[in-house]
Amino acid sequence: MGPFPHDAPPAEISAHNPMGTDGFEFVEFAHPDPAELGRVLELMGFRPVARHRSKAVTLYRQGDVNYIVNAEPDSFAAAFAAEHGPCACAMAFRVKDAKYAYERAIALGAEPYIGKVGPMELSIPAVRGIGGSLLYFVDRYGDKGSIYDVDFVWTGERDPHPEQAGLYYLDHLTHNVHRGRMDFWAGWYEKLFNFREIRFFNIEGKLTGLISRALTSPCGKIRIPINESLDDKSQIEEYLREYKGEEIGRAHV
């Protein structure tokens, strides 16, 4: 489904890669009981490696996978969790130029998000994505530094990459959508980022079925399968009813 992230060439803005995408930076989670979520992540081998300087936000990491748990009461994440329950409320793409990617996304019809930015805190541009979740654009990574050096304090050594359970990178993030909405979201990613479909599945079970379009970014490092139910009895429909909307579903590492 694309090159192993470390083998892919550095991102450049081009006709093929108009946003200069370069992989995932993080996934942000919200939970009515953030401590319980933290315990689950630690059982999976993630470690709390940094804490936000002024907010109840913790960075968990394993290998190159960054999971942010946002427990800040007065935040987008808290409001999102109050509406949807435990969820992935945001994700971030690495891009060559965050300002350029944000402005291009808005010009192509994406809905901007303007959040609260505290003193001495980075302002990371974002748009509304699947189910009203946020999609951030990050260009501060690798040789250009780290967003975590600015907004977070490391709990131990700087920028560690613990490898507790053998997870190294985020392979893909699944989206579950309402029936009839798959083409809309596939078109959204194609229009903004030039994602392409690399595989189509039509899975029919004894009682229910689903279709899935597996999309990948021009850089080959971001993969998003979009799932749609074929009826109202499937597990996907159950997820959507319980969640009260379309969602960032499973994160696969």
Where do the PLM segments sit?
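C-terminal flanking tails of non-heme Fe-dependent oxygenases
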Residues: 1-9, 202-211, 218, 225-246
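An N-terminus-focused feature that recognizes amino-terminal "leader" regions
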Residues: 1-154, 172
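Eukaryotic intrinsically disordered and solvent-exposed regulatory patches
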Residues: 12-13, 160, 201
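Extended non-catalytic domains of envelope/secretory-pathway proteins
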Residues: 18-21, 179, 186, 243, ...
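Acyltransferase donor/substrate-recognition loop-hinge adjacent to the catalytic core
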Residues: 135-177, 191, 196, 221-241
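Active-site rim elements
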Residues: 175, 248-249
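Beta-propeller domains
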Residues: 175-223
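Conserved small/polar residues in nucleotide/adenosyl-binding loops
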Residues: 251-253
